[in-house]
Design a protein with these regions (language model features):
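Secreted, disulfide-rich extracellular signaling modules
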Residues: 1-355
């Protein structure tokens, strides 16, 4: 037997809300801006060097000749020919990836002086130079904490002319495969010249953005924790049944959607324990994936429907972008109040009566 929410005109409701993202959990860092979001990168360095060489840096006998940053793009939101331009500032307040969220942003202190030059951007590489004195200060601080300002790293902040958002894999401490590398050339005149490649040991992004105006759509947005909740009234569904399939289907509103590359082409669906607090049930680790095909995201939530029919309270479904930490995409679906009922979320349940 079958129950189709569209054919049976079942009551439903949908909406979206903003959760608080922990930026340190992302495996990607984003920089850039568009009409609804701006993203900046924080990176912190610890350059390991023998004490004997640090002492030479402090005394001015081991000199930083150049410092060049190279980063390999892995994500794009917007036109690839659009402008990406940013400034690099020295951070003067302590920060950590642990617990860094939108409430941490106002407490960030940085110098207003841009310490970067020679920025070049293409599809495969972002490259720029850092003032030699910046790295020299880091090394001097390592040698003697009283000889230079404390090193809290760098802030990469987009300029107003920027019209796209680009992402890079976040660095993993001690990994030899990191794709964000600062190459530092040091020289002891007439004696030695060395090149040291170092990656950030703290490497995160933070994104500030506008939450879209509440309308009839069900909208998701990466980087700011914009999630959705969806409820179907299944009181007309018999209790003593076995649910074989329950296909949940959402239609994309392409006019309100901006997707990136790689695409935010899946949604995670989890069962809610409380529709008000958005608390999840104890089996919240069980996630159903809604996959995209053409302009429709669909997945089988039969196990959720079965739990509700077995007596668990139907508080609805929590939905989120699969890549909400590593994307700035905005994906909009037609919601439960859309004037065109055929475009609203659909739930088609296939079941059999228990004998």
């Amino acid at each position: 037997q079958e129950l189709d929410s569209y054919q049976a005109n079942i009551f439903q409701k949908s909406g979206y809300y903003q959760d608080k993202i922990k930026f340190g959990l992302s495996n990607v860092v984003l920089i850039g801006k568009n009409s609804y979001a701006e993203s900046s990168i924080l990176m912190r360095y610890r350059i390991n060097m023998p004490d004997s060489l640090l002492a030479l840096v402090k005394s001015g006998k081991y000199i930083v000749k150049s410092a060049t940053m190279q980063m390999i793009p892995r994500y794009l939101l917007g036109d690839k020919t659009a402008n990406l331009n940013f400034s690099v500032y020295q951070v003067r307040s302590n920060w950590s990836p642990v617990g860094f969220d939108r409430d941490s942003i106002p407490h960030l202190v940085y110098d207003p002086i841009d310490v970067a030059s020679g920025l070049t951007v293409n599809d495969t590489l972002v490259k720029f130079n850092i003032k030699n004195d910046v790295v020299t200060q880091w090394l001097k601080y390592s040698a003697d904490s009283n000889s230079a300002p404390k090193n809290f790293g760098l802030l990469l902040k987009p300029k107003p002319s920027t019209k796209k958002i680009v992402g890079f894999y976040s660095a993993i401490p001690s990994s030899s495969k990191n794709e964000t590398v600062l190459s530092v050339v040091l020289e002891r005149p007439s004696i030695r010249k060395d090149t040291v490649g170092v990656s950030p040991f703290f490497h995160i992004y933070y994104l500030t953005g506008q939450v879209p105006q509440q309308n009839s759509n069900l909208t998701f947005q990466g980087g700011i924790g914009l999630k959705g909740a969806l409820f179907f009234d299944l009181s007309t569904l018999p209790k003593n049944i076995i649910v074989n399939k329950a296909f949940l289907e959402l239609n994309v509103d392409t006019t309100s959607t901006l997707d990136g590359n790689p695409s935010s082409d899946s949604l995670f669906a989890q069962i809610l324990a409380d529709s008000t607090t958005k608390k999840l049930t104890r089996d919240s680790t069980v996630v159903t994936v809604l996959s995209k095909k053409d302009k429709i995201y669909t997945g089988d939530v039969a196990w959720m429907v079965q739990k509700w029919q077995n007596g668990e309270s139907n508080q609805g479904i929590l939905l989120s972008l699969w890549d909400e930490y590593s994307s700035a995409a905005r994906i909009a679906f037609y919601g439960s109040k859309d004037q065109n009922k055929a475009l609203r979320p659909k739930l088609k349940i296939i079941y059999m009566q228990k004998k």
